[in-house]
Amino acid sequence: MNGSTAEPVLLPGERLEPLARGVSVIVGGAHTFNTDTILLAAYSLPRKGEICADFGTGSGTIPLVWCARADPAFVGAVELQEDACSMLERSASLNGFTGKIRVIREDIKNLSSSGILLKGTLDRIACNPPYKPAGTGIQSEDGSARLARHETACVFSDIAAAASTLLRWGGRFCFCMRPERLCETLEILHAAGLEPKRLRFVQQRQEKAPFLFLAEAVRGGKPGLRVEPVLLVEVGNGSWSEEMLAVYGEYKENHR
């Protein structure tokens, strides 16, 4: 059961953002979250008692949503940047989740060999990865933002390899990505021994092309990909869809 156990300690430039009833996250600077993060958190929601990890957790939105809405036994929140780790440690304390969330400051490329998380033990891994290959698009001058948006610290194949090593047989890897990289990501998953099982596109409105896809792959899974109905963010009058309100509603209610 969650509940605030301490007064929030906010550093200059930081603020609290509500995520769910009684649960908030400390964000600031480049360490914040967006619609993609919330959608992935809902899409990858753990089952009760699962042992999980979130790769590149940033300020820790996904682990906090998981603990607020589900009951995982453990969440390893993996993040390379020290300031983001500090934010999540304080958020976990604030919300009473220090017994479930462990902040792991480590490079994803070194995670499998570090021994911090045991190989073949995780039930579920999520990752909201950098969408853009290094050297493409507009490069942010902010180092944290650049790491989040561009594959400068790691590439998707590094993430898939780490997930495959750390997941148990039948464990699930959930992620989101831009549609133009769909073919590439499916090839990478197969090469890592992760079988794509679920795929869902996200559109802003019915007439718009998808801007995101959500996917789930299973370590050692049998072939067979289920393409799920499109998730619409908005309906015809510009208001949020019922499904979007269901996954994002508590946050939106707090920002009216």
Model-derived features: where do they sit?
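Conserved SAM/SAH cofactor-binding pocket of Class I
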Residues: Y43-I138
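General small-molecule cofactor/ligand-binding pocket signal
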Residues: I26, R102-I104, K197-R200
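SAM-dependent Rossmann-like transferase core, predominantly class I methyltransferases
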Residues: E7-I51, T57-R69, E216
